[in-house]
Design a protein with these regions (language model features):
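Interhelical loop and helix-boundary elements at the membrane-water interface
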Residues: 1-25, 58-86, 107-137
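Residue-level signature of transmembrane alpha-helical entry/exit and packing/kink sites
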Residues: 4, 24, 41-49, 94-101, ...
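Short Lys/Arg-rich amphipathic alpha-helical segments
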Residues: 15-34, 44-48, 52
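Interfacial segments of multi-pass membrane proteins
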Residues: 26-38, 85-90, 143
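Alpha-helical transmembrane segments of multi-pass membrane proteins
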Residues: 31-32, 49-58, 101-110, 143
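Membrane interface segments of multi-pass transport proteins and intramembrane proteases
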Residues: 34-47, 115-125
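Contiguous, small/hydrophobic- and glycine-enriched helical/loop subdomains that border
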Residues: 39-66, 70-71
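Juxtamembrane boundary at the C-terminal end of a transmembrane helix
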Residues: 144-152
Length: 152
C-alpha cells in the first residue's frame, strides 16, 4: 500500500491519459508550494529529488515486481524525481522557469539521449528512477544555461 501510493505519487499514475505528464505537473505543483510557503530554493528541490530517489527506487521496484511489468506506466515517482532535479537548475523561480522546466524535463524524458536510455536498462526500480533522474540533470543544465542568458 505504501509502495503503491509513493510509486503512483498518491494516485497521479492512474491518470487515464499521460500519467507521466500528470506526475510531472503534480511534481511542479508540490515544488511550487514548497518554494512559495516553505522557502525551498531550486537547489533545495534538487536535494529533495535525491532524497526522494531512495524510497522511490524501492517503491518502483515493489510495484514493478508485483505487476510483472518492467516499467509500469502507473509508476510516476520517477517523474517527480526528474522534474525536481530539472528545477534545481533554475537561476530564478518564476512562471517562465516553471513552464520551461516542465517542457525540458518532458523533452529529455521522452527523447532519452545517451546515457538516459542506457540507465533505463538497469534492473528494477533503479532503472525506472535513474533514467528520469538523468533526464532531469539534462533539463537542469539547459534550464541553468537559459537563465544564465536571461531567457526567462
Amino acid at each position: 500500500m505504501i509502495a503503491t501510493s509513493l510509486a503512483t505519487w498518491f494516485g497521479c499514475g492512474y491518470a487515464p491519459k499521460g500519467p507521466g505528464t500528470a506526475g510531472s505537473v503534480a511534481a511542479l505543483a508540490i515544488a511550487w508550494l514548497l518554494n512559495t510557503y516553505a522557502g525551498v530554493s531550486s537547489i533545495g528541490l534538487g536535494w529533495l529529488a535525491l532524497l526522494l530517489a531512495i524510497p522511490g527506487i524501492w517503491a518502483a521496484d515493489v510495484v514493478a515486481r508485483s505487476s510483472g511489468v518492467k516499467d509500469p506506466q502507473i509508476v510516476v515517482v520517477d517523474e517527480v524525481v526528474g522534474q525536481w532535479m530539472t528545477l534545481a537548475g533554475a537561476t530564478t523561480l518564476n512562471w517562465k522557469s516553471w513552464l520551461l522546466a516542465l517542457a525540458l524535463f518532458r523533452l529529455f524524458d521522452i527523447w532519452k539521449p545517451p546515457p538516459v536510455r542506457q540507465l533505463e536498462r538497469l534492473p528494477g526500480g533503479l532503472g525506472i528512477v535513474a533514467d528520469d533522474a538523468m533526464a532531469g540533470v539534462y533539463g537542469a543544465l539547459v534550464l541553468f544555461a537559459a537563465g544564465w542568458f536571461n531567457l526567462y
